[in-house]
């Protein structure tokens, strides 16, 4: 795009490329040798930094500029149409695992939500960091790592999450992690040297 900031990585979907920036249209394009063809183009998803995630035929991302955006949105990748919009989550970065969205808001709230095109359904939320958070949560070794712009890094021990009545369970299925998410809970923070 011709925007002043083109920081969001291109997203691959079904052999096509989704390009977006915070001030211009998002566009799904098909590469044809040395030419391209636009599949759809609209303003339904305009991402500043974090690229978001594709699950099946749906894309989940944070729409808007990082300083003032507050919308997480699901769009249909075949049509570009909006499936749902969730306001009041300050410009977020998103990762996904086991059919769940792991969303870190700009102000340090971590959300766990269903990855469903039908609706936004929050499963858990906890304040995990202070300061400005722009980097996506990272999953590794049964933990979620989150970081703020000051360089503070936290390791969230998902297997030790305190929940009533059931704890979070994490299982390995071959090389794949499977999570059993609670309806609510408090994340245990373990500081790591950054």
Segments (PLM) and residue ranges:
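Aromatic (tryptophan-biased) beta-strands that constitute blades/sheets of beta-rich domains
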Residues: 1, 30, 34-43, 81-87, ...
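Short coil/turn segments that connect the beta-strands within blades of beta-propeller domains
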Residues: 14-16, 56-58, 98-99, 141-142
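Short, composition-biased motifs enriched in small/polar/acidic residues
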Residues: 160-194
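C-terminal hydrophobic structural anchor segments
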Residues: 83-121
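Blade-level signature of beta-propeller repeat domains, shared across WD40, Kelch, NHL, RCC1
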Residues: 108, 128-163
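Structural motif
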Residues: 23-30, 67-73, 108-113, 152-159
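Extracytoplasmic beta-rich repeat domains
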Residues: 1-13, 21-23, 40-54, 65-66, ...
